[in-house]
Regions:
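SAM-dependent methyltransferase catalytic region
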Residues: 1-141
C-alpha cells in the first residue's frame, strides 16, 4: 500500500486540501471543523459496480482512508461513533448497480442514493440515481 503522502486519488486530494486549510492545533473546535470537512469530502465521493466484491473493497478503502487521515492529523484513531457515521455515508455512496438500467443487478428495483445536506446529524434526501443522471432531482424537476 502507498503511504498517505504518495496517494493521488480524488479523496486523498480532498483530505490533503482539508489538512492544508484547517487549523492543526488539537482543540475541540479545530477537531470539529476538520471532521465536518472530512465528512463532506466522504459525502462527495460516489461509485457503483455490478460486482459485490468490488463494492465491498471500495467501501473498505474509503473507510480505511478516512481512519488513516484522521489518525495522521490527530495522533489517534477516530472513536467508534465517528467511524459508524463514515460507514453509513460510505454504505449509501458506494453501491451495487446495473449501470445500463440503474437497477439492483438482476432485478427491476431502481437504485436509491442519498443527496447529503448535513453532516451532524446526518441528513439527506433520497433520490433515484437515474433521476440524478437525467437531472431530475427534487430541487430541479
Amino acid at each position: 500500500p502507498h503511504t498517505i503522502s504518495h496517494r493521488v486519488g480524488i479523496l486523498d486530494r480532498k483530505f490533503r486540501v482539508i489538512d492544508e486549510n484547517t487549523p492543526s492545533e488539537p482543540t475541540v473546535a479545530n477537531k470539529r471543523l476538520w471532521l465536518r470537512k472530512a465528512l463532506q469530502a466522504v459525502q462527495s465521493v460516489y461509485g457503483y459496480d455490478w460486482q459485490g466484491d468490488n463494492v465491498f473493497l471500495s467501501r473498505e478503502s474509503i473507510l480505511v482512508s478516512f481512519c488513516e487521515y484522521y489518525a495522521r492529523r490527530w495522533g489517534r484513531r477516530p472513536k467508534l461513533p465517528t467511524i459508524m457515521k463514515v460507514a453509513e455515508i460510505v454504505s449509501w455512496n458506494i453501491w451495487q448497480m446495473d449501470g445500463t438500467r440503474f437497477t439492483i443487478p438482476e432485478t427491476d428495483c431502481l437504485c436509491v442514493i442519498r443527496e447529503w445536506r448535513r453532516t451532524s446529524p446526518l441528513v439527506a434526501d433520497n433520490i433515484l440515481f437515474r433521476d440524478l443522471i437525467l437531472k431530475k432531482t427534487p430541487n430541479n424537476k
